[in-house]
UniProtKB/Swiss-Prot annotation:
<keyword id="KW-0536">Nodulation</keyword>
<dbReference type="Pfam" id="PF02451">
    <property type="entry name" value="Nodulin"/>
</dbReference>
<dbReference type="GO" id="GO:0009877">
    <property type="term" value="P:nodulation"/>
</dbReference>
<dbReference type="InterPro" id="IPR003387">
    <property type="entry name" value="Nodulin"/>
</dbReference>
<feature type="signal peptide">
    <location>
        <begin position="1"/>
        <end position="20"/>
    </location>
</feature>
<protein>
    <recommendedName>
        <fullName>Nodulin-26B</fullName>
    </recommendedName>
</protein>
<keyword id="KW-0732">Signal</keyword>
<comment type="similarity">
    <text>Belongs to the nodulin 20 family.</text>
</comment>
Length: 219
């Protein structure tokens, strides 16, 4: 079982690394045609304006602004429920999450959490976007479910379409930051409007107009 778990981890990391590498070339990146994601790219610019126009010194650098763009767009995805499937969230921000003060460059991707040792790993897919994974402890005579160890008892593995989308967002955040920083007074300029056309046309270069609209906010 442990060998199988190691093989699965290796496979997931290989897929993630491959997708991240492929997305470095935006022209070759494959974007999941999900209308919720398209609308999220449009409406997420309000978060960009709110969180990334503070005038912080960290935002004056390309890496800092890119990280803030990515963080604010991901917050938008969560808050608007665009990452939900069957009322379950694909990923959840930490409790008490606040706008970041970027200091480091944007990571290539956010890896999935490690599989607990001595456990049985199982996944099943309930849609084309997400797979639900569970771990069952293999400790003799106890077989404790991970809801006693990891809180929820399951973790939503970032299935390939979502991972691709987040990877492209990461690449486009860097491109948007690079372009926006060439504008005068970037800290006080209407960053949301400035980055809107840049960011959306980067994510959906051949059909940015289809991303217009408003996202329904889910409780």
């Amino acid at each position: 079982m442990e060998k199988m778990x190691v093989m699965l981890i290796t496979l997931f990391l290989f897929i993630a690394a491959t997708v991240a590498e492929d997305a470095d070339n935006i022209g070759e990146a494959i974007i999941p045609e999900n209308p919720k994601f398209k609308k999220f790219v449009t409406d997420g610019t309000s978060h960009v304006a709110e969180r990334c126009s503070s005038g912080s010194e960290a935002l004056h650098g390309e890496g800092g602004l890119a990280l803030c763009l990515f963080d604010s767009m991901e917050n938008c995805l969560v808050e608007h429920g665009a990452a939900k499937v069957n009322q379950r969230s694909l990923f959840v921000l930490p409790k008490g999450s606040t706008p970041i003060e970027p200091k480091d460059s944007l990571p290539s991707f956010i890896p999935s959490p490690p599989i607990p040792p001595k456990s049985k790993f199982e996944c099943w897919c309930d849609s084309l976007i997400s797979c639900v994974c569970t771990w069952t402890s293999m400790v003799p005579s106890t077989r404790l479910l991970n809801n006693q160890q990891l809180g929820q008892g399951f973790y939503y593995f970032q299935y390939e379409p979502l991972l691709q989308f987040r990877t492209v967002l990461r690449t486009c955040s860097l491109e948007s930051a690079r372009t926006c920083l060439n504008a005068p007074n970037v800290a006080t300029s209407p960053l949301g409007r400035l980055s809107h056309s840049i960011h959306e046309s980067c994510v959906y270069p051949s059909g940015a107009e289809s991303g217009t609209g408003s996202l329904p906010i889910k409780a």
